[in-house]
Amino acid sequence: MREVIMGYQGEMSLKGLNRNQFESAMMKILRYRLKTVGKFRVYCTQSTFYMEPEEEDIDMDLAFDRVKTVFGLAALSRAVVCEKDFNTICQTAEDYLGDSLHGIRTFKVEARRADKSFPMTSPELMRELGAYLLGKHNYLKVDVHNPDFKVIVEVRDYGAYIHGPKIPGEGGLPVGTSGRALNMLSGGIDSPVAAYRMAKRGLGLDHIHFASPPYTSERAKLKVKALAQLITPYTGSTNLFVVPYTKPQEYIRDNAPDVLFTVLMRRSMMRIANVIAKKQGCEALVTGESLAQVTSQTVKALQCTDAAQDLPILRPLIGMDKTEIIETSRHINTFETSILPYEDCCTIFTPPHPKIRPELDEILEAEAGMPGLAQLEAEAAENAERIRIRITDDVDFVG
């Protein structure tokens, strides 16, 4: 009895002539995720990815955990493969899934015969295998509409694959197939969720964080690093750029109108992010902004922010409310870390009554009165610290 992991395509199967490129990217990602677990053969046929261990004693629980968060898979199964012989299929189904049939009342057999050379039709295989399992578990009843458990048999080119119910995958597209962007990782709830949602659309990501010591602490920086690590099961390995932002932030505080401070700071950050993004080959910036969530996220304020640089700014949370964002943060296991009470440079020096609808003309006028800001921004970008975040790294931060 040989166990395998099966991953089923979703949106990828609709890609037409480009489909091979997406499948190749997916197989590369799956191989990378599995290489620290053991040696696997990874291939794709009939819209399904197969991950077959080529070594003995591989931890299949760990292997499944490594691939279940890969974007591009609509569903996954842990299956066993056996010879395409009816008696062998029956015995293998009982050996592999028999324990799962204890303690339930109803079940159903589903069969798919992709290999038409198999002598039984799909309905015949369902009926006969169901009868065999009923003979082994006479307390069970068949319920084809709402069973407690499904036994699924897929007769394919390379054998008969037997498994229980499919487990939903993350869907989306393989990371990297839609380009690369730089995500503004603040340390709050929103920005990790923004990274997750854009990675789901196939976008490869690096992160940028702005630190303002002594106003922000080393613990705050470690918290952001932990967030970057927590989302690597979805984004894959990535880079985190930590920008020393104290001097530009103090300069804006000391030389700009108080009510415009927040928007001016956001524009300054965008300019620095633009420089680093282009050096890394990124084609866009990603933020966790949600419309009207805070005063710097009104349409007017966002318009002023966008005008500071020339890369597209992607805002995947723009129409989400806080409850939806929090639900996603819990799903990706970042919520508890995000709410740890460490300083965020976006909240220091915040004026009590910032302007909600700033005009671009007044923003440009305020920046004209800060001739030294460009040099401080250039120095901050040049001195950014690059931290490599790998998917196998342990999250070692404890709040």
Segments the model singles out, each with a brief description of its role:
Residues Q293, P341-F349:
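Small/polar glycine-rich anion-binding or flexible loop at a beta-alpha turn
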Residues N333-P341:
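A short alpha-helix-loop-beta-strand transition element characteristic
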Residues R357, D361-A378, E382:
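Glycine/aspartate-rich loop-and-adjacent alpha/beta segment that forms the canonical ThDP
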Residues G188:
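Conserved G/P- and acidic residue-centered "switch" motifs that form tight phosphate/ATP-binding loops
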Residues M1-L182, P192-T238, A307, K355-L360, ...:
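RNA-binding accessory domains that recognize and position tRNA/RNA substrates
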Residues A131-L133, K166, G172-S178, Y245, ...:
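Active-site adenylate/phosphate-handling loop in enzymes that bind or generate adenylated species
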Residues A228-D254, Y342-D344:
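A conserved beta-strand->alpha-helix junction
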Residues N183, H207-H209, V242, T287, ...:
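Structural beta-sheet core signal
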